[in-house]
Amino acid sequence: MRELSGAIPRWAQVRRNLRTLALALAPVALWFTAPDAFAQEARTARCPPAAHIPSRAELQQLLHDARDRGLLWRIEQGKGQGSRTSWLYGTIHVAAMDWMVPGPTVMNALRDSDALALELNVIDPNVMNALMSALRAQPGAAPLPPALAERLEKFKQQECVGEEVNALRPEAQVITLATFIARREGLDPSFGIDITLAGVATSLGKQVMGLESVETQIRELVSDDPAKVQKAVSTGLDQLERKDAGRLLANLAQAWADGRMGLIETYPEWCDCVKTDADRADLERLIAGRNPAMARAIVAEINAGKNVFAAVGALHMAGPKGLPQLLAQQGFKVTRVDFPAPPPVVAK
């Protein structure tokens, strides 16, 4: 799997921006992701461990142990010799290092495709520059109320965040804090499935494209309205300060790794984070509300003659408004791909 060896150097080159990439890729849950460009390396026992680039030996072990994870659908158009096959893959944007190497079924599907379609084209420098610019604190923006600012500062200190994070908008600061919650559970945006797929696709000579624009993503992440900013920061801290915040993320991540679509579909029922009509409206807007445009973008690429491997956050696959259902409504044959069972764990 020579292409994976080529993907790791690319992973190293963009690592400083990976958390910011994750911000754009997973706006639904404030505790999912955060920008590493502003993270202070852990130096004390109470700080979470920092992600590291896999060594040659670790990479070899990852390649040896790689197995299929996540949620894959085959998207078929037409019959006989004129038929075309594309793929829809539900990803997770915060993952364990052991998960970053695609398994054989996923790798073969990507290899057989013409292009990789992500929510954003995370390897386009213009996209990154626009994203970074939009996440920075805006001159003249109203400050947070003192009590809320103190609460945010206290949590930053607790999670060992460096001063550089203050360059971000307050909402992005809250999302930044979330990466440390993930690290405490052995998860990190640096190992996010989307960025790994982008590296592999580039090594394979595949085109990488975005299904959404930076403007679309940022519109869902930040606001210039002081009242909305305060609400986002307060609500985000409410989630981060929960004792079970890290465990909830770990449960969702493990559900993804095991391909348990039922758990992912019922996430709003067990996360204890969707309690009000406003919460439900926000979730609808952030997930189902974005799906029709992404489905149209996928269909446009397929109709242009490409076999597409579309990789989008797993929550976008759920329910009657999920991407599999929307593509089926467009006349495609959509079939969930079953992965081989993992080998049994042998006690040493």
Regions found by a protein language model. Give the residues of each.
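N-terminal secretory signal peptides that target proteins for export/translocation
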Residues: 1-16
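Bacterial N-terminal signal peptides
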Residues: 17-33
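Short hydrophobic "helix-edge" motifs at membrane interfaces and signal-peptide entry regions
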Residues: 20, 80-82, 303-304
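Short, well-ordered alpha-helical scaffold segments within catalytic/effector domains
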Residues: 21, 103, 291-295
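Sec/Tat signal peptide C-region and signal peptidase I cleavage site
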Residues: 35-39
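Structured, acidic catalytic/metal-binding patches in enzyme active sites
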Residues: 40-67, 71-285
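C-terminal soluble interaction/assembly domains
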Residues: 284-348
